């Protein structure tokens, strides 16, 4: 603290004296250092604000500006500015104290005042965020009242709050108790002598300290502080305001008794002690006080008491000053003081109505008001009722009452005129002033009387009691005021005022209906309601009588009105005739309710025969019949008057009216009027009902419109927020996917490079091996050819010998007979001898040279081989022949190699096709583990062998053809042998299978015989089984067991044993299930028979081979699918058909899981070596089914495997068919992913994921059809799940034919001319995905499909179709065209390759074989095409008929 104060002193060198003065001045006031420090800091901040420039036009002052100017200069601001701001927030009272001191400094001159207001205004602008609202109001009010009441030592009380008075008075009290000597001097001596106590002058001039003393009613402190200086008496009225405000009894009594005396002449209280010098001199001379500042008017003091209902001060005035009652005037109002400076006239006018002070909102107690008014009534002081200050003479002339005078104290009685024929009211007061007046004064009175008659019409409206009733003042205050006005409980039997002259009739009715019972009893039972003779046609009693029969009054209120009319029966007769009362009774209640503020009566003269009451005109003529008899018949024959007391009162009035000889009325006229009134009432009620209905409708329509607008606005806002969130999420997902794709592409490129390198190495190794093999084959061929040539040479030599002999014999004959032909032949062809000679002349090494010169690889030559020109073969010819043969053999081997390569390629295509088909069977999820087919490309080469046949003169072409035929025969023979071997093996296998089946049947029979012959054998009815553990097939919930057994000693069955105690509804359910089995559903387990004993029920079921769970866990699911010759989707249909069968009979399985899906292996077929395998549904949950409805029988949680039941089952809600749909979705996922679960493979967390709806379908991303279907099936909201029929109609389960039809329908939608308006939308939708704006195809589809072969034009087609490869629409056209014209395309491709003499693409020809193969090809290239088209065309299915069937 000291260091902080030192910093303040250093920073405030310019005003160091002020700081020290403030510290000295607050030693006793603030004994705590913390308060001392806070006040000093606040004063320093205010002084700093005085340095800021102030401009009235511009507000440049703020905390930021304050920091800029002083933050760098002041040390304490640099360190502790945050702490000072917290001080401003927390120390509210200290802030008020310092600011108040700042306002009350002794400044002379207006300039300094304006400067102070500007400094405070700167302080408010700088620190307004850290000040409370009370302090801000405090400052604003101080600035606004500064000019007007700055010089007043005691300010009006309205500027300060009560809490500040208490706290400042407590601080003042603490300061006095710190020093006993000071306290004694103040209380005992009343004189200040010590100069050290200079701080008390602060409280002398401070109004807050004086207010605290008056509030605590401390008379000694009050007098000692007030009498120090004579200047304190300048505002004596303000002091009395404070005394009356707090009702300080001790201060008022001491002040009045000791220091004031009554001046009877001037009716004032004069101060009699410690007067000023001038006052003492005047008082000694005249013995009267002429100083107005030292006196107060009694009427003014009385008004102070009435403002705040100061009952204690009023008692003192009445009791201590006996002449006070006779000296005060009669015109005392409850409207309070008309302040000259601070109060608003409107607030002054209504202060008594709101019962609160002007600024403090301090509620005055109701009892205090009542006691104060009763005090005046007991002391015979009554309040005037006027607000417009009408002269007393007007009241005297109008009401004939006495008015108390200000100047006269005597009491004389005068007689006054009567205001009623029967009652006389007198007053016991005189007015001597009126007796002493001259004639001139009487003339003035007459003139005033005439002028004031005009104002009297508005007098009732402005009267005090009428305003109190209008603003719903407390009833106790009103009753006390009424009793004062009529001088009740004053010891006077006569009335002074009449209530009907003070309140209007309608206001009286309102007050009687609104006020409580005490007010009504006072008004009615005390005969406060009366009417003067001047208005004999008043409507008050008529209205009372009308409301007696209405529904507005309660049962408690009616007796008061009955009592009133019993006391005053003459009022009814003197006002209106009795028949008119009954007529108006029928209609007045509704009219009064609707037109409460309208005039109830309009009249002109007193004696008029026609008077208008509530819309009725009474123009009745005298008749001979007595109207009283007519009224009596009306009472007896009508149900108008249901109240018996009312009937009695009416009869009393009738009897009373007989004596008065009232007018007569006909009975028929009265009945007609009664009927008319009833009709009018009904019509009015109907009109009111219609109006109300119209109003209600309008209000409802407006409310509905508003609600719709609000809902739309909320929806728009939510949609915008959701869109923004989705866009953000999409951007993030795109970035992540883009990164993933980049990483995947990099990895793929690396893997591709590695694979290419491996393939290159393998190809190099294969080429080397192939070259080695070729070389070996060529070497073998050379050796064989050499051997054959040797053999041929030998044969030639032998043949030459024979030829020589023959030639010798023939030479002679030929020469002789054919000389000329021989010559010609010799020219063309050498003779055989010459050939032989040439052949002999050639060396034998020529053959070897020619053989060695043969190239290892011979190119193919033409089929035309040069024939020998002579029938005689020479060695050269034989060599040529051999060479030709070798060439032919090499050509054939090359052709064989090419054929083998084509066969290998064809086989590879078939293998790929099988893989594609298998992938399609598996739903497109990778290659299953059971597909592993390998082909060896290396084929064994066939060797060339030639038989040693005799030489002939046949051409070489014939030899080659024979050689080819022989090879083909050999190949055919070898193929036949292979086929025979295969058939023999198949027959052997079939025989083995039959033997195995027989053996299996024998084994089963042996096993069953073993079961029967065991010691634990059980026979119940037709069932026979053994209870050993080896014969238990499974265990279930509630003590259920399944055994192997026999039914009727022949048929093997599974016997299910269930306990009756745990399953009370078995019989009902079993009958229903047996009835289902009679309907022959192949996908359901058959219930064969039922037996019972005392404890158990036994069911005979179909004996199956295993369950889906066993297949997956053992890894045999792939073998099961292969052997069934079905796809996995087709096998899943078996389960769906079974559930469809159950749901069609209103049965819910409620416990579907892989353990309850059983496998049934059928018989194998000889042709395909495949079996008719299938899935069947078992365990229909006997404790959970109900046949009568589509709901399951109980709401208990099933006891099957966890993770296959939806959210509503876990919450124990009633279960519907959607439960089975959820389980089917999980089972489909289980099948397609080979054992995975959509909610996690960990069984512990599956239920948690189901509740939170956290599913993981990423393993199915490659198959979007399955992904979308399963996602809808396993959704948390059961209303979103599809039915079993919708599941079967999903594209996932479509066959190829339906898919082709769907593509045709899609193409028709695109081609329709009527759809041209949204064709552009269709193209955009087809090119992009639903979830985001990403394109469906990342690349143009001509890069994904072999388009060049499929675009071959057919024969005779002149127009070629053009396609846009970046649009899905043209892809659909392309697929449809290829499916429709696949045969023509295939022929065109074959012809094109025949013309070009090249080999066609066998893959293209393979998938062009049928429409199904074409669709499979396209699905393998673009897997999710059908799913994409299905999703994009969904919105058009409702409007287009040919699309509707695909979606429903």
Swiss-Prot record:
Composition skew (Low complexity), residue ranges: 428-437, 978-1008
Xref: CDD domains: RNase_Ire1_like
A biological process from GO: mRNA processing
Region: Disordered, residue numbers: 412-446, 975-1008
Keyword terms: ATP-binding, Coiled coil, Kinase, Nucleotide-binding, Serine/threonine-protein kinase, Transferase
Location of the Protein kinase domain: 1027-1293
Domain KEN positions: 1296-1448
Reaction catalysis annotation: L-seryl-[protein] + ATP = O-phospho-L-seryl-[protein] + ADP + H(+); L-threonyl-[protein] + ATP = O-phospho-L-threonyl-[protein] + ADP + H(+)
Family that this chain belongs to: Belongs to the protein kinase superfamily. Ser/Thr protein kinase family.
Coiled coil, from the record: 666-817, 887-921, 974-1016
Annotated source species: Dictyostelium discoideum (Social amoeba)
GO cellular component: IRE1-TRAF2-ASK1 complex
EC number: 2.7.11.1
Cysteines paired by S-S bonds: none
Protein name (Swiss-Prot/TrEMBL): Probable serine/threonine-protein kinase irlB
Biased segments, Acidic residues type: 412-423
Binding annotation for ATP: 1033-1041, 1056
One GO MF term: protein serine/threonine kinase activity
InterPro entries for this protein: IRE1/2-like, KEN_dom, KEN_sf, Kinase-like_dom_sf, Prot_kinase_dom
């Amino acid at each position: 603290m000291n260091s902080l104060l030192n910093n303040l002193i250093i920073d405030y060198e310019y005003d160091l004296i002020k700081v020290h003065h403030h510290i000295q001045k607050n030693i006793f006031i603030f004994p705590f250092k913390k308060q001392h420090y806070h006040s000093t800091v606040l004063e320093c901040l205010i002084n700093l604000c005085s340095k800021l420039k102030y401009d009235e036009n511009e507000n440049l002052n703020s905390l930021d500006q304050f920091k800029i100017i002083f933050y760098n200069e002041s040390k304490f601001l640099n360190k502790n500015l945050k702490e000072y701001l917290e001080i401003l927030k927390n120390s509210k009272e200290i802030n008020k104290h310092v600011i108040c001191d700042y306002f009350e400094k002794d400044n002379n001159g207006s300039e300094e005042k304006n400067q102070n207001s500007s400094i405070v205004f700167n302080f408010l602008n700088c620190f307004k965020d850290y000040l409370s609202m009370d302090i801000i109001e405090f400052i604003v009010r101080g600035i606004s009242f500064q000019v007007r009441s700055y010089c007043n030592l005691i300010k009006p009380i309205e500027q300060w709050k009560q809490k500040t008075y208490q706290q400042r008075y407590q601080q003042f009290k603490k300061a006095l108790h710190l020093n006993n000597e000071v306290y004694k001097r103040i209380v005992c001596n009343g004189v200040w002598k010590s100069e050290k106590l200079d701080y008390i002058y602060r409280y002398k001039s401070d109004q807050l300290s004086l207010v605290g003393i008056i509030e605590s009613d401390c008379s000694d402190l009050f007098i000692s502080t007030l009498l120090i200086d004579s200047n304190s008496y300048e505002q004596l009225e303000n002091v009395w305001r404070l005394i009356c405000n707090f009702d300080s009894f001790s201060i008022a009594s001491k002040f009045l008794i000791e220091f004031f005396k009554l001046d009877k002449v001037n009716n004032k209280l004069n101060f009699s002690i410690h007067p000023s010098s001038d006052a003492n001199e005047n008082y000694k001379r005249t013995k009267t006080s002429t100083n107005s500042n030292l006196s107060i008017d009694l009427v003014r003091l009385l008004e102070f008491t009435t403002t705040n209902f100061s009952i204690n001060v009023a008692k003192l005035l009445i009791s201590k000053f006996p002449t006070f009652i006779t000296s005060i005037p009669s015109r005392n109002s409850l409207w309070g003081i008309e302040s000259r400076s601070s109060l608003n006239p409107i607030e002054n006018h209504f202060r008594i109505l709101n019962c609160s002070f002007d600024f403090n909102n301090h509620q005055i107690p109701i009892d205090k008001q009542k006691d104060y008014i009763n005090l005046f009534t007991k002391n015979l002081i009554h309040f005037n009722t006027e607000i417009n200050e009408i002269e007393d003479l007007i009241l005297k002339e109008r009401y004939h009452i006495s008015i108390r005078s200000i100047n006269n104290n005597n009491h004389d009685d005068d007689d006054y005129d009567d205001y009623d024929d029967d009652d006389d009211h007198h007053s016991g007061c005189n007015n001597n002033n009126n007796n002493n007046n001259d004639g001139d004064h009487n003339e003035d009175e007459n003139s005033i009387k005439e002028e004031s008659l005009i104002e009297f019409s508005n007098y009732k409206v402005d009267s005090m009691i009428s305003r109190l009733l209008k603003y719903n003042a407390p009833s106790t205050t009103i009753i006390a005021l009424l009793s004062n006005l009529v001088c009740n409980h004053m010891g006077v039997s006569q009335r002074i005022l009449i209530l009907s002259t003070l309140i209007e009739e309608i206001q009286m009715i309102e007050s009687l209906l609104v006020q409580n019972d005490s007010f009504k009893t006072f008004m009615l039972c005390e005969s406060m309601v009366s009417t003067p003779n001047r208005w004999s046609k008043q409507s008050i009693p008529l209205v009372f009588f009308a409301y007696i029969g209405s529904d507005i009054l309660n049962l408690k209120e009616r007796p008061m009105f009955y009592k009133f009319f019993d006391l005053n029966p003459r009022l009814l007769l003197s006002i209106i005739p009795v028949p008119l009362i009954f007529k108006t009774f029928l209609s007045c209640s509704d009219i009064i309710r609707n037109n409460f503020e309208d005039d109830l009566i309009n009249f002109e003269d007193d004696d008029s025969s026609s008077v208008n009451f509530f819309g009725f005109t009474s123009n009745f003529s005298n008749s001979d019949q007595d109207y009283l008899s007519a009224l009596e018949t009306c009472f007896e024959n009508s149900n108008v008057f249901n109240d018996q007391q009312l009937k009695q009162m009416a009869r009393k009035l009738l009897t009373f009216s007989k004596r008065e000889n009232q007018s007569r009325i006909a009975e028929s006229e009265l009945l007609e009027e009664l009927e008319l009134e009833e009709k009018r009432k009904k019509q009015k009620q109907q009109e009111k009902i219609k109006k109300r209905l119209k109003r209600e409708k309008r209000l409802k329509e407006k409310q509905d419109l508003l609600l719709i607008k609000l809902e739309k606005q909320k929806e728009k806002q939510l949609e915008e927020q959701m869109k923004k969130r989705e866009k953000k999420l999409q951007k993030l997902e795109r970035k992540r996917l883009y990164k993933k794709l980049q990483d995947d592409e990099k990895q793929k490129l690396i893997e591709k490079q590695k694979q290419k390198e491996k393939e290159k190495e393998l190809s190099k190794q294969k080429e080397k091996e192939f070259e080695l093999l070729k070389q070996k084959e060529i070497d073998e061929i050379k050796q064989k050819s050499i051997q054959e040539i040797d053999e041929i040479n030998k044969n030639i030599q032998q043949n030459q010998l024979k030829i020589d002999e023959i030639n010798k014999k023939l030479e002679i004959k030929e020469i002789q007979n054919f000389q000329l032909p021989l010559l010609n032949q010799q020219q063309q062809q050498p003779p055989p001898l010459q050939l032989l000679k040439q052949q002999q002349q050639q060396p034998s090494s020529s053959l070897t040279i020619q053989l060695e010169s043969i190239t290892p690889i011979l190119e193919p030559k033409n089929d035309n081989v040069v024939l020998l020109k002579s029938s005689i073969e020479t060695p050269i010819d034989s060599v040529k022949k051999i060479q030709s043969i070798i060439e032919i053999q090499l050509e054939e081997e090359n052709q064989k190699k090419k054929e083998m390569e084509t066969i290998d390629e064809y086989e590879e295509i078939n293998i790929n096709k099988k893989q594609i088909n298998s992938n399609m069977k598996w739903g497109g999820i990778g290659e299953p583990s059971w597909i592993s087919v390998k082909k060896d490309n290396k084929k064994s080469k066939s060797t060339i062998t030639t038989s040693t046949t005799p030489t002939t003169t046949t051409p070489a072409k014939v030899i080659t053809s024979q050689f080819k035929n022989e090879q083909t025969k050999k190949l055919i023979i070898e193929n036949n042998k292979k086929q025979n071997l295969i058939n023999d093996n198949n027959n052997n296998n079939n025989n083995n299978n039959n033997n195995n089946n027989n053996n299996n049947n024998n084994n089963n029979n042996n096993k069953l015989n073993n079961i029967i012959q065991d010691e634990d054998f059980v026979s119940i009815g037709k069932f026979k089984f053994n209870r050993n553990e080896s014969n238990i097939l499974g265990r279930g919930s509630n003590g259920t067991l399944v055994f192997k057994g026999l039914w009727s000693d022949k048929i093997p069955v599974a016997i299910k044993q269930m306990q009756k105690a745990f399953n009370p509804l078995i019989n009902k359910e079993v009958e229903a299930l047996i009835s289902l089995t009679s309907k022959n559903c192949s996908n359901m387990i058959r219930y064969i028979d039922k037996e019972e004993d005392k404890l158990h029920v036994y069911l005979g079921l179909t004996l199956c081979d295993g369950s889906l769970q066993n297949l997956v866990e053992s890894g045999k699911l792939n073998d099961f699918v292969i052997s069934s010759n079905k796809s996995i989707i087709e096998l899943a249909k078996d389960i769906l058909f079974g559930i469809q069968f159950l749901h069609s009979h209103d049965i819910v399985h409620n416990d579907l899981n892989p353990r309850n899906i059983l496998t049934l292996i059928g018989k194998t077929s000889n042709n395909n070596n495949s079996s008719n395998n299938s899935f069947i549904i078992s365990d229909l949950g006997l404790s959970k089914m109900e046949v009568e409805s589509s709901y399951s029988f109980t709401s208990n949680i099933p006891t099957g495997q966890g993770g296959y039941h939806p959210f509503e089952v876990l919450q124990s809600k009633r279960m519907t068919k959607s439960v089975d749909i959820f389980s089917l979705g999980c089972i489909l996922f289980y099948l397609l992913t080979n054992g995975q679960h959509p909610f996690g493979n960990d069984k512990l967390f599956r239920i948690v994921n189901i509740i939170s709806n956290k599913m993981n379908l990423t393993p199915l991303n490659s198959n979007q059809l399955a992904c979308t279907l399963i996602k809808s099936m396993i959704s948390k909201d059961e209303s979103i799940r599809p039915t079993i029929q919708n599941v079967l109609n999903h594209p996932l389960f479509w066959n190829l034919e339906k898919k082709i039809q769907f593509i045709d329908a899609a193409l028709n939608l695109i081609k329709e001319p009527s759809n041209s308006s949204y064709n552009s939308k269709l193209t955009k939708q087809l090119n992009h995905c639903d979830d985001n704006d990403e394109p469906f195809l990342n690349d143009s589809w001509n890069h994904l499909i072999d388009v060049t072969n499929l675009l071959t034009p057919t024969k005779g087609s002149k127009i070629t179709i053009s396609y846009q490869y970046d649009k899905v629409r043209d892809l659909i056209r392309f697929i449809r065209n290829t499916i429709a014209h696949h045969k023509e395309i295939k022929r065109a491709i074959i012809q094109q390759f025949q013309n070009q003499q090249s080999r066609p693409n066998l893959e293209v020809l393979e998938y062009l074989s049928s429409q199904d193969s074409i669709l499979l090809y396209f699905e393998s290239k673009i897997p999710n095409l059908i799913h994409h088209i299905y999703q994009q065309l969904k919105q058009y299915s409702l409007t287009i008929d040919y699309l509707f069937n695909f979606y429903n």
